């Protein structure tokens, strides 16, 4: 089975309150996006598809100047995560059996984690396999309510979320 990857990097990052695109904020001397690209590339059989939108030229220039391997997909209007993934669909290789989707602002996501996620997906044969974080303070983030057996009931953006 062949694995492809999509990295979402089109958002504005308004919570950061910075003129610099969120994914270009430096971590240990390089933009955090480059860590996400390295992890995705390591876990994929192809160059990652990088979805860019807000400050697209600046993000693209940073990736290219670093010599990172990526294909670019433009999300002209930032209409959410699902729309960002759809913006990348034509750039994903046709022979890919599995597509990993991750975010460009996750510099601590390790290649091993992505490979394990892909392996679990293949073993379980699900339609969708995802990781999530259980946090103490949900403010500032969307929610993933789950059923009694741990199954995903929905993915809810923060603006539409309830305290539960």
Each language-model region and where it sits:
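Conserved G/P- and acidic residue-centered "switch" motifs that form tight phosphate/ATP-binding loops
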Residues: 11, 22, 105
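Short N-terminal binding/cap micro-motifs at the start of the first secondary-structure element
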Residues: 13-17, 58, 139
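N-terminal nucleotide-binding beta1-loop-alpha1 segment
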Residues: 1-18
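Short beta-strand/turn micro-motifs composed of small residues
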Residues: 9, 52, 103, 132-133
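Conserved beta-strand scaffold positions in the cores of enzyme catalytic domains, especially
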Residues: 24, 72, 128-130
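Conserved N-terminal catalytic core of the sugar/cofactor nucleotidyltransferase
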Residues: 1-4, 31-103, 108-119, 123, ...
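Conserved core of the sugar-phosphate nucleotidyltransferase
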Residues: 109-164
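Short catalytic helix/loop segments, enriched in acidic residues and glycine
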Residues: 19-36
């Amino acid at each position: 089975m062949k694995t492809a990857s999509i990295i979402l990097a089109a958002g504005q990052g308004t919570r950061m309150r910075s003129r610099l695109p969120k994914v270009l904020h430096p971590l240990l001397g390089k933009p955090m996006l480059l860590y996400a690209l390295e992890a995705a590339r390591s876990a994929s059989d192809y160059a990652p598809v990088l979805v860019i939108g807000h400050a697209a030229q600046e993000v693209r220039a940073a990736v290219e100047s670093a010599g990172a391997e990526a294909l670019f997909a433009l999300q002209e209007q930032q209409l959410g995560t699902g729309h960002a993934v759809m913006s990348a669909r034509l750039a994903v290789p046709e022979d890919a059996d599995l597509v990993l989707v991750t975010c460009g602002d996750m510099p601590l996501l390790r290649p091993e984690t992505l490979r394990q996620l892909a392996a679990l997906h293949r073993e379980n044969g699900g339609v969708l396999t995802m990781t999530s974080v259980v946090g103490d303070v949900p403010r500032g983030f969307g929610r993933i309510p789950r059923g009694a057996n741990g199954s995903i009931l929905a993915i809810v953006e923060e603006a539409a979320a309830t305290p539960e």
